[in-house]
């Protein structure tokens, strides 16, 4: 029951982030660029959630995001899957208690995910390659995501610890003889 409540909470957070991304940060852009809050969500799910559940949840969130606002189904699902997998891989080598480490992981995952999404859009939509515009957008998005992580990290860490405790409950039952 706790796991179902936690998954429902994740989906509620997803819809809140969708509202923030589309309405609030649509007004507060930096040079016309909005942060990608979904990469941050997928990264933190990869860091704190059980590695068995994370790919499925992030793929489902990505498909929902594709249905809501994308012209190609599957790109956001792949992007969020890559971000969550990056979080799973990085957590083996780094501590999730360090804010600087999380910021560096976020910078790397934002760059990798946006690069993959850009390449997939070029392949599928056959658009022109604009390297300078891409690097301008990605650098502003990285700065924006990093600032949001700096500000929201205590809240995210508290939620992440709750999720982690929910999905990694001790299954040990002691017997007294």
Q: Model-found features: residue ranges?
A:
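Terminal, non-globular segments
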Residues: 1-177
